[in-house]
Curated annotation (Swiss-Prot):
Part of the 50S ribosomal subunit. Forms a cluster with proteins L3 and L19. In the 70S ribosome, L14 and L19 interact and together make contacts with the 16S rRNA in bridges B5 and B8. One of its GO terms (biological process) is translation. GO terms for molecular function: large ribosomal subunit rRNA binding; structural constituent of ribosome. SUPFAM superfamilies: Ribosomal protein L14. This is Large ribosomal subunit protein uL14. PROSITE patterns: RIBOSOMAL_L14. One of its GO terms (cellular component) is cytosolic large ribosomal subunit. Transmembrane segments: none annotated. NCBIfam families: rplN_bact. Signal peptide: none annotated. It comes from the Bacteria. Belongs to the universal ribosomal protein uL14 family. InterPro entries: Ribosomal_uL14, Ribosomal_uL14_bac-type, Ribosomal_uL14_CS, Ribosomal_uL14_sf.
Length: 122
């Protein structure tokens, strides 16, 4: 569960390394987000020469969380870190590569480009 002020690692090669969550999108009372949710973030750390710079406000989709996501069959999936992928307005990733595994729930939320670029879908 990701909330305001949560820090996310970046799982793509857009140039950002760490994000700070400003807002979880999806309603005025929405407090937390899980895998597949879109969040508004600011870039806290960035690599030199990247597409995004430190201080940029971007939208990202959550691809991994430490707190588990419950699936329809009753199983849970948990990861070792909280991570996100920076996206454009049309839900396509800003980077050209995705690092690390992503959850199968992204396929249900129409993030097919991220799923196809990911090395492993759990």
């Amino acid at each position: 569960m990701i909330q305001n002020e949560s820090r996310l690692k970046v799982a793509d090669n857009s140039g950002a390394r760490e994000l700070l969550v400003i807002r979880v999108l999806g309603g005025s009372k929405r407090k937390t987000g899980n895998i597949g949710d879109i969040v508004v973030c600011t870039v806290k750390q960035a690599t030199p020469g990247g597409v995004v710079k430190k201080g940029d406000v971007v939208k990202a989709v959550i691809v991994r969380t430490k707190s588990g996501a419950r699936r329809e069959d009753g199983s849970y999936i948990k990861f070792d870190e909280n991570a996100g992928v920076i996206i454009n307005a049309d839900k396509s990733p800003r980077g050209t590569r995705i690092f690390g595994p992503v959850a199968r729930e992204l396929r249900e939320n129409d993030f097919m480009k991220i799923v196809s670029l990911a090395p492993e879908v759990l």
